[in-house]
């Protein structure tokens, strides 16, 4: 690995751990967190353990998607795909809106250059696929949340229609935009990359994103149970997709990420009582630690290894 890259890696890792230390030092609800751990029963610890065990499955799904996206740029095995995904977590952790995540992954390519920018565009496409799945499930949940007596069948039909549009309209739209002249080289490259996708590619990306969505939704459910949030099945079915929808569409920077997650947890769960909303806030913190701090640690350990 070139000296320049090594310096960048060291700086990124240093910034990530420095920021992590800041977040830990400034968190102001350790008393509630400690109380939850003291009061939890054995089955709640089982829920927490399963949620932690699902964290590598979560990242494996993302690595699967990343490997699929860049297969035409730099073929790699699953180990290398996971290594790049974990390292991208570090770069995303220290940049606004996680803008550095995909360029960070591409930094570990054997050859960079134009491939680096193309890979970044492909990563953005993977992010759009994940956002599509979150919206498809979150939109009906939002409708049901705002109007519980509305038609659930209509909400589901809206979700299916959105999924169909996402699958069949995106490639055709990009092919149309490709005919225009773009001043920005990055914009032109992104449109060209998306225009080269076929319907099978889009369906695969949405399928992988759906699997990952199921995994981190299960993680949230298990973490909520660990923290003592017990709701009926319908309420959980609505609250989980709604939560992920809201944190996805809310612009935020790393310094405010935990606060944004906690604020939306309060907004969603407060109708079930103050105790439930307080427990939900703790659950979002625990899940943030599982899916952000653990990948950060793994990423710093595997950054320099190439198999």
Q: For each of these PLM feature ranges, what is it?
A:
Residues 101-110, 253-270:
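Re-entrant/interfacial helical elements at transmembrane boundaries that shape
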Residues 67-76, 101-116:
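Transmembrane-helix boundary and interhelical linker motifs in polytopic inner-membrane proteins
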Residues 82-111:
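Extended non-transmembrane interhelical loops and adjacent amphipathic helices
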Residues 79-83, 101, 112-127, 274-286:
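Membrane-interface alpha-helices at helix entry/exit sites of multi-pass transporters
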Residues 1-85, 142-250, 282-284, 288-307:
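Predominantly cytoplasmic-facing regulatory/coupling regions of multi-pass membrane proteins
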Residues 91-95, 241-262:
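Transmembrane alpha-helix interface/packing and boundary motifs in multi-pass membrane proteins
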Residues 90-96, 117-141, 246, 283-297:
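Membrane-embedded alpha-helical segments of transport systems
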């Amino acid at each position: 690995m070139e000296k320049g890259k090594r310096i960048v890696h060291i700086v990124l890792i240093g910034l990530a751990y420095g920021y992590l230390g800041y977040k830990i030092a400034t968190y102001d609800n350790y008393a509630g967190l400690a109380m939850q751990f003291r009061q939890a029963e054995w089955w709640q610890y089982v829920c927490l353990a399963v949620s932690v065990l699902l964290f590598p499955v979560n990242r494996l799904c993302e690595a699967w998607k990343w490997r699929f996206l860049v297969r035409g740029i730099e073929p790699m095995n699953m180990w290398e795909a996971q290594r790049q995904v974990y390292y991208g977590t570090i770069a995303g952790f220290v940049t606004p809106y996680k803008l550095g995540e995909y360029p960070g992954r591409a930094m570990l390519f054997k050859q960079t250059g134009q491939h680096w920018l193309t890979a970044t565009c492909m990563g953005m496409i993977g992010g759009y696929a994940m956002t599509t799945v979150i919206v498809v499930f979150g939109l009906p949940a939002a409708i049901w949340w705002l109007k519980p007596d509305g038609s659930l069948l209509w909400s589901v039909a809206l979700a299916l229609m959105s999924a169909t549009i996402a699958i069949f309209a995106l490639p055709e739209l990009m092919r149309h935009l490709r005919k225009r002249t773009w001043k920005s080289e990055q914009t032109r490259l992104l449109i060209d990359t998306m225009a080269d996708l076929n319907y099978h590619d889009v369906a695969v990306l949405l399928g992988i994103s759906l699997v990952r969505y199921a995994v981190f939704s299960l993680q949230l459910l298990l973490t909520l149970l660990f923290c003592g949030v017990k709701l009926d099945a319908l309420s959980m079915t609505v609250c989980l997709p709604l939560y992920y929808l809201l944190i996805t569409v809310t612009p935020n920077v790393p310094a405010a990420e935990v606060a944004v997650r906690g604020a939306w947890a309060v907004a969603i769960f407060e109708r079930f009582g103050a105790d439930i909303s307080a427990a939900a806030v703790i659950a979002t913190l625990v899940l943030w630690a599982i899916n952000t701090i653990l990948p950060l640690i793994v990423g710093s350990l595997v950054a320099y290894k190439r198999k």
